[in-house]
């Protein structure tokens, strides 16, 4: 994956993270019991969004940002690409789940609430995946710094 493609992938993810964080905030007000989980997801998304934005800036200003002198088989750029795909799958899963909870109505009535069931375990799993992806990216970036 060349530097332009990598930076483009990161910028696309930044937008997706921002969208999902905004949706988290919108859904949070409707599901009071889910506030802590949604806050955690939103905070992770916002932190990762900022980190990925900085990574994109770095890649745009330093073409060697995704290289390492120890990468003799030239596998790091492919690993980075797979990491970005993992983030993309994770964020799409979160956004899809949040979209089912989002309603155009300001306040949900009883019937509206009955139609949608808060899935705490599923949302915690999304949060866990998001944190795992962040940990994997952090490890990869540490390798790139050597």
Segments from the language model and where they lie:
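N-terminal amphipathic alpha-helical segments
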Residues: 1-75, 79, 104, 141-145
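Amphipathic alpha-helix face/heptad-repeat signature
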Residues: 9, 13, 37, 41-44, ...
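A generic short-segment signal for beta-strand/edge and adjacent turn/coil regions
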Residues: 9, 98-99, 105-108
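A structural signal for well-ordered alpha-helices, especially hydrophobic packing surfaces
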Residues: 45, 49-52, 56, 81-84, ...
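Regulatory helix-to-disordered linker/tail regions at the edges of structured cores
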Residues: 85, 103-146
């Amino acid at each position: 994956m060349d530097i332009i493609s990598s930076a483009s992938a990161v910028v696309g993810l930044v937008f997706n993270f921002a969208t999902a964080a905004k949706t988290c905030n919108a859904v949070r007000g409707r599901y009071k019991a889910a506030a802590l989980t949604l806050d955690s997801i939103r905070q992770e998304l916002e932190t990762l969004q900022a980190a990925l934005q900085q990574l994109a800036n770095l890649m745009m200003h330093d073409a060697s940002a995704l290289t390492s002198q120890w990468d003799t088989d030239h596998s790091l750029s492919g690993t980075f690409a797979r990491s970005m795909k993992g983030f993309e799958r994770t964020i799409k899963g979160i956004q899809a789940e949040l979209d089912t909870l989002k309603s155009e109505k300001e306040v949900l009535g009883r019937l509206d609430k009955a139609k949608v069931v808060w899935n705490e375990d599923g949302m915690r799993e999304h949060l866990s995946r998001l944190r795992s992806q962040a940990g994997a990216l952090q490890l990869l970036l540490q390798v790139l710094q050597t």
